[in-house]
A protein has these predicted regions:
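Structural motif
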Residues: 13-17, 41-45, 384-385
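Non-catalytic, surface beta->alpha helical segment in thiol-disulfide oxidoreductase systems
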Residues: 70, 75-111
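Short, internal strand/loop/helix patches
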Residues: 50-77
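Non-transmembrane, aqueous-exposed alpha-helical and coiled segments at domain scale
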Residues: 128-405
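Thiol-based oxidoreductase modules, predominantly thioredoxin-like and allied folds used
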Residues: 35-59
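Iron-sulfur (Fe-S) cluster-binding modules
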Residues: 104-137, 144
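Short active-site neighborhood of thiol/selenol oxidoreductases, capturing the structured segment around
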Residues: 4-28
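N-terminal leader/targeting and pre-domain segments
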Residues: 1-7, 105-108
């Protein structure tokens, strides 16, 4: 949509529902007697304020393009360009912006404003689609009115066997607010079909997986990590082994988005853990074509192929983090990906010294696949706090634990 022409002079945006807006009507009337022309836009009631011949911003286009978050807002426009503004009612600020003195002498010097309708949570997604500068380029799929949208997505093969969230334009635009990258930016080439995926397509699948916008950078990072020759997601799919991407997240951002790094860390119940991993798996399936029975040749598979993503307990760990061991700062948000099976439990309730406990870990790790196999297999050891405490009390650091095992 074309940006509305900004009239020179003073522009005031109000709504009747706001008590502060009603309070400052006499002040706006004062402004009309000054040297600058005054244009009043009202968001809700087209007759408010009646004495000022307001323009009804019925579709909120003016409020959206003027980036109005609070009403009343007063803007000063010169040659079509905003030079200053103030929000709410602060007498000194109104006088500074308007260049007039003795405004509202009978009013208190300050009163906060109200939220603009253009940032109303019930309206903002629709307004973002209607007026936002970003135009989504993905193909639209129309669902018949009588068709169940959830069943329609199952029928089209877009799911991992669980219901997915319909990726409406409003939801996708909201998801895109989680990143500063452009929707048209290419994130990766997704195997096995080697299809370019843009930030927009990542956002669509993140919506379907149930992600929040703040999870989107983690989905993008995880996708970049699996879609390269080092990880080789094509090979992970094509093997008959029951493996899939295991995504370990590090950094302060894991706590900011509420990832689980504690009890039940591999289990259900945490939205960030489950949906970040799920979004990546949906992308491999929906964009890359990695579907079971086709390129995905796993004989048994494992439940982690829906999602296997978790955060390291950096605050509770006695050691440096996984990301630090790979050369990154503790303050850096990072993902590490590993082609892994489902978790298995190492039980030792008797060991009280690190040597005995190390023997237990080594004995369990030797059983990977087949204890008599001459092939070596990699593994991630996620140590519980009780076992970690045994090593920490003995003064063993992370490097020694790994070396001894």
């Amino acid at each position: 949509m074309t940006l509305p022409t900004r009239p020179d002079g003073l522009v005031v945006i109000v709504k009747r529902e706001c008590e502060t807006c009603r309070m400052v009507v006499p002040v706006i009337e004062q402004l009309t007697n000054g040297p600058l022309p005054v244009t009043v836009y009202v968001q809700d009631d087209s007759a408010f304020p009646e004495s000022l011949a307001p323009i009804h911003d019925a579709d909120l286009s003016i409020s959206w393009h003027y980036d109005i978050e609070t009403v009343p807002t007063v803007l000063r426009i010169e040659n079509g360009v905003e030079v200053t503004r103030t929000v709410g009612w602060v007498r000194d600020e109104w006088q500074r912006v308007t260049g007039q003195t003795d405004l509202g002498p009978n009013l208190s010097a300050f009163r906060p404003g109200c939220g603009s309708l253009s940032v109303d949570p019930d309206l903002v997604d629709e307004l973002r689609v209607r007026f936002g500068a970003t135009t989504l380029s993905a193909r639209r799929v129309d669902i018949a009115e009588a068709e169940d949208e959830f069943e329609a997505m199952f029928d089209r093969g877009w799911t991992d066997g669980l219901p997915v969230v319909p990726p409406t334009e409003q939801r996708v635009m909201r998801m895109l607010t989680g990143t500063t990258r452009q929707p048209t930016d290419v994130v990766a080439i997704v195997p096995p079909d080697l299809v370019e995926i843009t930030v927009e397509k990542v956002a669509i699948n993140a919506v379907m997986a149930g992600c929040k916008p703040e999870y989107l950078p983690w989905v993008i990072a995880g996708l970049e990590a699996v879609c390269n020759d080092t990880f080789n997601i094509h090979g992970v799919l094509a093997t008959t082994m029951p493996v899939g991407p295991v995504i370990v997240c590090n950094g302060p951002g894991t706590r900011a988005i509420g990832m689980n790094s504690g009890m039940n860390v591999f289990g259900q119940g945490n939205r960030a853990n489950l949906t970040i991993g799920r979004a990546i798996q949906l992308i491999i399936r929906n964009i890359g074509g990695g579907r079971p029975g086709e390129v995905d040749r796993a004989t048994h598979g494992n439940p982690g192929k829906i999602s296997f993503c978790f955060a390291e307990d950096e605050l509770g760990s006695p050691w440096s983090t996984l990301a630090e061991s790979r050369g990154l700062s503790r303050t850096t948000d990072a993902v590490t990906v590993f082609p892994g099976e489902g978790p298995r439990c190492v039980v030792d309730q008797l060991a009280r010294d690190p040597e005995s406990l190390t023997n237990t870990f080594a004995a369990c790790l030797r059983t990977m696949h087949n204890p008599k196999s001459v092939l070596a297999f990699d593994a991630i050891v996620v140590m519980g706090p009780e076992h970690a405490r045994v090593y920490a009390e003995a003064g063993w650091d992370r490097e020694r634990v790994l070396e001894e095992i």
